[in-house]
Amino acid sequence: SHGFGATYSERTGIIPPKDIDVIMIAPKGSGTSLRRLFLEGRGLNSSYAILQDATGKAWDRVIALGIGVGSGYLFETTFKKEVYSDLTGERGTLMGAIQGIFAAQYQVLRENGHTPSEAFNETVEELTQSLMPLVAENGMDWMYANCSTTAQRGALDWWKPFRDATLPVFKKLYAEVAAGNEAQRSIDSNSKTDYREKLDAELKEMRESEMWQAGATVRNLRPERNK
């Protein structure tokens, strides 16, 4: 995944033969999104990297592969940089950090008397259904310039305290990735015979949390689900 096996070869034992090209296309999104957009005649931007060019045609092949999966923009990286940024992103803003932020804000709202529905809508639903599509299309600066004046002032005042509070966590995370500790943790966890059972228990805990139970209710109330 994103060059994991080859980058951490001393841990995975994956060493490609010297007589083959070793290339990578890394679409910036989930496999389900990549497939859906491909069927719509669109695609995701991707990074590409060449670890070995045994044939002299590795560059041609990797670019063709990127175009073939529908990437509109390709940017060059290395296997090492790709897997470092990927592991950091997954544990950070893409999944780990955002779940932590969701949970913290939801908890504060509930502790101060807000209903589960209100807390979920203000924490998750408005962000994912309204704001992030606008940020994706126009950028965060546009979002700040075009929101209400109360939201604008508050966002400008509070984003730096949030940055300062989370920066040490992100620095620790990147250091763990660079040291190979996150890779080893993933390898060790996935190698255990009871990994699937423990994973199911962790996911069940999240799924049955009040926040995501409220989320299931809110999603079912979306207008498109009641046609």
For the regions a protein language model found, what residue spans apply to each?
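A broadly tuned preference for mixed-charge, low-complexity surface segments
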Residues: 25-32, 53, 97-104, 158-159
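General "foldedness" signal
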Residues: 16, 34-39, 62, 101, ...
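NAD(P)-dependent Rossmann-like dehydrogenase/reductase catalytic/cofactor-binding core
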Residues: 45, 49, 111-227
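Active-site-proximal catalytic alpha-helix in oxidoreductases
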Residues: 56-111, 117-135
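Rossmann-fold dinucleotide-binding core
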Residues: 3-88
